[in-house]
């Protein structure tokens, strides 16, 4: 599946198209005939989304977008070359463009496959917006304010506690927030505030929650966590779309299945 590979496969040292998630595929049968299928996935390698080893890449889809989207589409997203994004060059600049990988061609195939399983053009564009937003978000830089304090939330509305870290490149944060459909301001409901404050899990008897100011390193960690969680949700949504397309027709209730377990990580092919 080209688009499942785009979102779940990556270049490693041993394999330029390594699956970085496990899956269990059920091929459903009724009276000796295949009537459908279903897929479960697990153990998506989330760490690879924001960090890669030397000469390795993140998930293909990010590099494919940078190569395969039209100039007009890139302009709408504000998309730059892959080498401009910190999230994509952790493995080194030489790992970004690989001779054995045609990202533009693979992107066209992934896009066509998404259409085949019923993900329409508007849904695809929303996916690209989210992914472009994550790329921008990971280019956000933080600086210390040299101060910081805690604040309380009452009835779900945070107070304006003093932040310990501030965004140094506001335009990048604003672009990321726009693509992700979020507010970028430093007010209590803005993305900058939410990334730079941590909520204390223990609420008081009055229903208030304590927010603690984070330092720049912790803010970067918060962005990494948000990025991994968001990408995981996108990946799970894609699996739902595939299963909806593969499910049996009405009246073709399966009587049995053949299960195929595919575990990622087998990259030594000597035997």
Regions found by a protein language model. Give the residues of each.
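Alpha-helical bundle cores of large, well-folded domains in eukaryotic cytoskeletal
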Residues: 1-271
